[in-house]
């Protein structure tokens, strides 16, 4: 599917944002570990979260989708033995968290995925879980899928996690730690990539009744065994998805209200609003959401985005239209996402005539020179590339997004929502 974007100015819209992908993943998995049934309200129903839910079903978890919610019934025995490999598509979050989840139970589980997922590393997670007694067999390439988990539960003890490439390695170990046979001391190497997602994991563990103590900046002590509590959970709206709508306001001199969102969000990507303010936008929190207003004139920025790497494609588009040179730093881990996001963003900016330089850990972008592309924008099978470059098409004509259906990974209603910017 190909989508042609028509330029527009002076957008004024009020838009609803779907549930958070990151929180939905974690809520499903913590519910699977719980001692009772859970109801998750406002879950994101998208390719990635469906992959997580389907994998849990293969492991014996009851998952029942309903309009506006999902019911999760944990199995009496952790876990059932799958008759076939558990296929995870291109979902890195599903992969990292489910490997740890499987290791908390008993059984033999094989995980595999799409060719790109087979290129995304899991070695740091495997090494950490092996310190707690888990056994793994990477059946083709060491440290990558396909991979067997030979599960006999986790012992207690000390574990050191190298999460400098992905905070998901640390989140996975922390989520599994309460299920171990004895107290687990989790330490990690710094800096952690995308640390706010780790903070989200800890907050959600606490909400489900798990006791832990963070006695150092890089250490958490988790008493074990503990049981997660079941119950009701409401998933907040996705700040990452909202960012494309905020960027649309910023780029077109618009006024966009997104809801339901709160300044108390667990999501680190909500801090992207502060970046928009630095670039010249006005941000106002209202009763049920946040409003972004812009004149369309943007200032360049020089930023370390290690803690919100998913915002890099969006920021790169804004930088392409800002008045000067912008730099995005400390995001080398973007090279092992759904695509090599640094290379992909740089390549597609070139199609818009935007001078840019790909750095080992980031991008340098000279704004103000964007022109209509002569060829389609290739999202590189990456949902965030497709959505970010759709925003660029609001400012310059002729932008066509190839393989536009890739947005279903995280924001299935993106194109319908995007159309509402014009109404």
Swiss-Prot record:
InterPro entries in the cross-refs: Enolpyruvate_Tfrase_dom, Enolpyruvate_Tfrase_sf, EPSP_synthase, EPSP_synthase_CS, RNA3'P_cycl/enolpyr_Trfase_a/b
Gene Ontology terms for molecular function: 3-phosphoshikimate 1-carboxyvinyltransferase activity
Pathway annotation: Metabolic intermediate biosynthesis; chorismate biosynthesis; chorismate from D-erythrose 4-phosphate and phosphoenolpyruvate: step 6/7
Catalysis: reaction(s): 3-phosphoshikimate + phosphoenolpyruvate = 5-O-(1-carboxyvinyl)-3-phosphoshikimate + phosphate
Gene Ontology terms describing biological process: amino acid biosynthetic process; aromatic amino acid family biosynthetic process; chorismate biosynthetic process
Positions that bind phosphoenolpyruvate: 21, 92, 120, 168, 341, 384, 409
Domain of life of the native organism: Bacteria
Class of this enzyme: transferase
SUPFAM superfamilies linked to this entry: EPT/RTPC-like
Subcellular location: Cytoplasm
Catalytic site positions: 310
Subunit annotation: Monomer.
HAMAP family associated with the record: EPSP_synth
Identification of the protein by name: 3-phosphoshikimate 1-carboxyvinyltransferase
Species: Syntrophobacter fumaroxidans (strain DSM 10017 / MPOB)
């Amino acid at each position: 599917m190909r989508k042609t974007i028509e330029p527009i100015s002076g957008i004024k819209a009020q838009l609803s944002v779907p549930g958070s992908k990151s929180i939905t993943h974690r809520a499903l998995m913590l519910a699977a570990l719980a001692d009772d049934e859970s109801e998750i309200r406002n879950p994101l129903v998208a390719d990635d979260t469906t992959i997580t839910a389907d994998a849990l079903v293969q492991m014996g978890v009851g998952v029942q989708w309903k309009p506006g919610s999902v019911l999760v019934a944990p199995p009496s025995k952790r876990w059932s033995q799958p008759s076939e490999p558990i296929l995870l598509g291109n979902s890195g979050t599903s992969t990292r968290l489910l490997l740890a989840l499987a290791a908390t139970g008993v059984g033999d589980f094989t995980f595999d995925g799409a060719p790109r997922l087979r290129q995304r590393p899991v070695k740091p997670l495997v090494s950490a879980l092996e310190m707690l007694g888990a056994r793994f067999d990477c059946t083709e390439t060491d440290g990558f899928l396909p991979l067997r988990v030979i599960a006999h539960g986790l012992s207690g003890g000390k574990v050191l996690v190298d999460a400098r490439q992905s905070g998901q390695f640390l989140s996975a170990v922390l989520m599994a730690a309460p299920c171990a046979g004895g107290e687990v001391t989790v330490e990690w190497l710094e800096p952690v990539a995308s640390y706010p997602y780790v903070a989200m994991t800890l907050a959600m563990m606490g909400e489900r009744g798990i006791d832990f103590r963070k006695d150092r900046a890089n250490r958490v002590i988790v008493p074990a065994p503990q049981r997660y509590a079941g119950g009701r959970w409401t998933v907040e709206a996705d700040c990452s998805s909202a960012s494309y709508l905020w960027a649309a306001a910023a780029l077109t001199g618009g006024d966009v209200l997104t809801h339901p969102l709160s300044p108390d969000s667990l999501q680190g990507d909500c801090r992207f609003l502060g970046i928009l303010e630095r670039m010249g936008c006005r941000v106002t929190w209202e009763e049920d959401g946040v409003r972004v207003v812009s004149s369309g004139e943007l200032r360049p920025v020089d930023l370390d985005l290690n803690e919100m790497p998913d915002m890099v494609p969006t920021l790169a588009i804004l930088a392409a239209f800002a008045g000067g040179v912008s730099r995005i730093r400390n995001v080398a881990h973007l090279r092992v996402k759904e695509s090599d996001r640094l290379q992909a963003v740089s390549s597609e900016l070139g199609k818009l005539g935007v001078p840019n330089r790909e750095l080992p850990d980031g991008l340098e972008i000279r704004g103000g020179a964007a022109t209509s592309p002569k060829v389609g924008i290739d999202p590189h099978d990456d949902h965030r590339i497709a959505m970010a470059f759709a925003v660029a098409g609001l400012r310059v004509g002729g932008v066509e997004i190839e393989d536009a259906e890739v947005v279903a990974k995280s924001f299935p209603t993106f194109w319908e929502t995007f159309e509402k910017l014009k109404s």
